Amino acid sequence: MRSLKVYRYFLVIKTKDLGIVNLKLPPKISITKDKLRDFNINKFFYKQIGIDHYWRDRLIWSDKTWSKYALNKNLETWIMKSGKELVGFYEQEYHPSKDEMELINMGILKNYRGKKFGSYLLEHFIKESLKYKPKRLWVHTCSLDHKYALPNYKSKGFNIFKEEVIDFNT
């Protein structure tokens, strides 16, 4: 086991600073909410995408824990497809007590990376979040995530409000 210095970034955008979000998806691309709240989809994406980025906190979760997570009334899971093929996902959680929306996880399956699908997912997150009328949207990312993650957030107007360096054991 070796230790890495990992840079973690917390980003925010105040919704009053957002204009109209015009999301135009490429042909055959769709983004739909998982209305069934099937924890298996969250688990699948977490494992498949996370393996390349050291996502491992949830790997020890039981199916019962996964199910409880997916059934959280404030959580939504959105799935991107190209035709019938899975491309990526994101999870958003509304925090009513703070009047904010958190982007918990977002990722693209390996075969679809580097094709701007992350940008479309982030735009979709912003657009869907505005339906809740939160004061702010926020996300955290780190140096282990995809190299375009941080630039993607910044390009949409998110600003870093907190940075930290942690030791991470691989």
What function would you assign to each model-found segment?
Residues 105-108, 114-129, 150-155:
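Conserved acetyl-CoA-binding loop-helix of GNAT-fold acetyltransferases
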Residues 129-141:
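Conserved GNAT acetyl-CoA-binding A-motif
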Residues 59-61, 70-77, 81-100, 104-108:
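A conserved beta-strand-loop-helix scaffold within acyl/acetyltransferase catalytic domains
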Residues 76, 135, 159:
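Short acidic/polar active-site loop segments enriched in Thr and Asp
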Residues 1-35:
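Acyl-donor-binding surface of acyltransferase catalytic domains
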